[in-house]
């Protein structure tokens, strides 16, 4: 096992010692966005950026001190592969007390664009809090509730740049039909039923829709990994309201503030570094 090559990350476990001090894995869908996130954190913290790990064609991975920045692609199968290989790597490195953060974008359920949603639980398309996988012909259900300690800490972070809420997240298997879009190649949805279903989601306490949280929380719950999903609303699905503002920085700011607080406690960053980092990110708002 010590000479095993992680197939999709293209990292050999003999090099796992490089990852022993990791405290956070910050993951998002887009490779370019995560690369830029890593570069900005490195510049503002004055911590050298590792060379890009040669992860092949599927993932990019950067290390800045105790943080890994990596893209997870689109959808549950892609993030699930990353979660498996990342966790194998960190466990082999004997990393301790690490946290996984997923940052990204979502659609709002009567929630306006620019609002940052911290997912308290991921809900499947049957409106149940389970991630279901088929192993040997048997459906295995894994709970998808968030780590309440992490969620409460994120909710309580002082922030004047944007609105932050916590609530249930609907996780779907695709972007078009399961998310009730009528502009896909296949569209057999009764338009009259869309608003009725959106109202059902709202009444169930669901505040946003995305495509990864179910697998993410199901995996992290199974292995007792501290975790949180932080997504910014790009469109309010109730009225399809959106604007041209680039909100990508919003979940990054919340993640940065949380990580800085924790790394200050770990004595892995000092107060000056934390201030520089937060100032660097918030000046873009």
Language-model-detected regions and their locations in the chain:
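Glycine-rich beta-alpha junction loops
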Residues: 30, 107, 170-176, 215, ...
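Flexible, glycine/charged-enriched surface loops at secondary-structure junctions
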Residues: 46-52, 97, 161-168, 265-279
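Zn-dependent metallopeptidase/amidohydrolase metal-coordination segment
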Residues: 214-248
């Amino acid at each position: 096992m010590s000479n095993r090559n992680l197939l999709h990350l293209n990292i050999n476990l003999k090099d796992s010692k490089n990852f022993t001090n990791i405290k956070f894995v910050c993951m998002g869908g887009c490779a370019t966005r995560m690369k830029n996130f890593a570069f900005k954190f490195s510049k503002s913290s004055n911590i050298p950026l590792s060379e890009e790990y040669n992860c092949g064609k599927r993932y990019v991975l950067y290390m800045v001190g105790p943080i890994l920045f990596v893209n997870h692609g689109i959808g549950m199968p892609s993030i699930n592969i990353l979660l498996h290989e990342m966790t194998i790597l960190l466990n082999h490195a004997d990393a301790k007390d690490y946290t996984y953060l997923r940052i990204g974008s979502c659609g709002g359920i009567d929630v306006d664009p620019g609002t940052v949603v911290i997912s308290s639980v991921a809900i499947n398309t049957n409106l149940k809090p389970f991630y279901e996988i088929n192993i040997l012909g048997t459906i295995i259900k894994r709970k998808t509730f968030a780590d309440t300690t992490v969620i409460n800490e994120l909710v309580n972070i002082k922030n004047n740049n944007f609105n932050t809420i916590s609530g249930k997240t609907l996780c779907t298997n695709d972007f078009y039909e399961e998310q009730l879009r009528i502009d896909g190649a296949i569209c057999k949805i009764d338009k009259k039923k869309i608003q009725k279903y959106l109202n059902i989601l709202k009444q169930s306490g669901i505040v946003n829709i995305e495509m990864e949280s179910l697998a993410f929380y199901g995996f992290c719950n199974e292995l007792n990994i501290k975790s949180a999903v932080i997504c910014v609303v790009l469109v309010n699905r109730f009225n399809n309201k959106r604007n041209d503002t680039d909100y990508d920085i919003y979940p990054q700011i919340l993640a940065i503030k949380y990580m800085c607080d924790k790394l200050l406690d770990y004595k892995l960053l000092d107060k000056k570094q934390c201030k520089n980092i937060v100032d660097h990110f918030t000046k873009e708002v």
